[in-house]
Swiss-Prot record:
One of its GO terms (molecular function) is kinase activity. It is an enzyme of class 2 (transferase). Involved in the biosynthesis of the antifungal agent validamycin A. Catalyzes the phosphorylation of valienone and validone to their 7-phosphate derivatives. The gene is vldC. Disulfide bonds: none annotated. This is C(7)-cyclitol 7-kinase. Its EC number is 2.7.1.214. One of its GO terms (biological process) is antibiotic biosynthetic process. Transmembrane segments: none annotated. Gene3D superfamilies: 3.30.420.40. It catalyses: valienone + ATP = valienone 7-phosphate + ADP + H(+); validone + ATP = validone 7-phosphate + ADP + H(+). InterPro entries: ATPase_NBD, ROK.
Amino acid sequence: MTALTPAPCDLVVADLGGTTLRVGRITAGTSEVHDVKRVPTNGLGRYGALAPQELQDRVMEQLTREIAAHLNRPGQAPAQAVAVSFAGPMTADGVVLAGPTLWGGPAAPLPVADVLTQQLGLPVVAANDVTAAAWRYAAAEPEPFCLTTVSSGIGNKVFRHGEIVIDQLGYGGEIGHWLVDHAEDAAPCECGGRGHLGAIASGRGALFAVRAAAAADASAFARSALAGPSGGVPEAITNEAFAAAARAGDTFARESLRRSLRPLASAVSLLFTAIGVRRYLFVGGFALALGDTFLTLLGDELVRVGCFGLDEYATRAMLALGEDDDDHCLIGIGQLAAARLGAPRAVEVTA
């Protein structure tokens, strides 16, 4: 059972990611997201040749248009507020500072909440996407927790005493850009740097690593469960096949994955040692596709690194997976909107 707060009014909720834009509704007095529409984001992934500012304009036009279409649906009451989760660092007052997966390089700071309010004529709540995802679990987690998304990149947020632990200017919760490999030829990060945690322990980074391992050790690769689906071609290995092989116990796949997860274990150990958070929830397509295998291998590495003062049982017990769906940001931004707009009570719903 997951405790969720019902919406105080009819809401349109949106999750703007680098790959997909999701827009849905939450009916007043409920917490369930329905009528979800998913469309490819009109950003860097589709129009990479365009300049960053042009991409930002294109993304905002699409976001505004799709939200407007959800405000008044046949047979439904008009929505009275909007809540948006956004893939990029954001200030406390809703200004997006960057959009690496949306428009790439530098563009003008984007006051997304103000822009949407002006365009739509409704109150707008906006937050970073990982902040939104963390709010999904806020009512269900009585102790401070760190939510980390492991998908094409890595991001995190710490939720403590009813609030996300970030600076007013949006700094914090970006462990994906923590430098863990100082080599000049370290894996490239989408931000333009190299050797960042998100370039190594993410789904994209782990795939890069297993392909490199396959190319470097042809005989071990040939004996692996990955050889068949890829036709023996390292560059043809997919994340889906990699996750399936690791779950099935394939030694080659699991050892490559273990190496990729080592710096993530170091990040968890550092967070625990620095601020004492003892609950770590993991979401994101790559982590959830691996399931218990992700927790087992990450736990192995975390025990090896160590968490000062904790034994093996207590160390492994800190790690858990979030709900196995792609609605974390939609549900979470609805929860944040309920907290900010005001809601009288919490209800229990089946996860």
